[in-house]
Swiss-Prot record:
This is Urease subunit beta. The gene is ureB. Disulfide bonds: none annotated. It comes from Polaromonas sp. (strain JS666 / ATCC BAA-500). Its main location: cytoplasm. One of its GO terms (cellular component) is urease complex. GO terms for molecular function: urease activity.
Length: 112
């Protein structure tokens, strides 16, 4: 048993069933660890994470709510992202969107 692991009587739980996903390779080019939470707009993560930010626009990590992925210095890992749902509005983070993700499809500012 893994700490925090849950056993249920029903079928397996599938996270974000039916939503579009994307698999990306991410490289931490920083000299410190970077941790990204489950609902953080992935395109707006720390600039020291190297990956295709345009492809990640409007997506977050496809992991359980309240969890995170940690990228150690120099580490490269593959992550799965999932589309935001609902109204698809993003505010805060690095301030690169500040509104609807789908507004003309070009609400994403430069992230370098």
């Amino acid at each position: 048993m893994t700490p925090g692991e849950l056993f249920t009587d029903g079928p397996d739980h599938v996270l974000n069933a039916g939503r579009r996903t994307l698999t990306l390779v991410v490289q931490n080019t920083a000299d410190r660890p970077i941790q990204v939470g489950s609902h953080y707009h992935f395109a707006e993560t720390n600039a020291a994470l190297g990956f295709d930010r345009q492809a990640a626009h409007g997506m977050r990590l496809n992991i359980a709510s309240g969890t995170a992925v940690r990228f150690e210095p120099g580490q490269q890992r593959t992550v799965e992202l999932v589309d935001y749902a609902g109204e698809r509005k993003v505010f805060g983070f690095r301030g690169l969107v500040q509104g609807g993700l789908d507004a003309s499809g070009q609400s994403h500012k430069e992230t370098t």
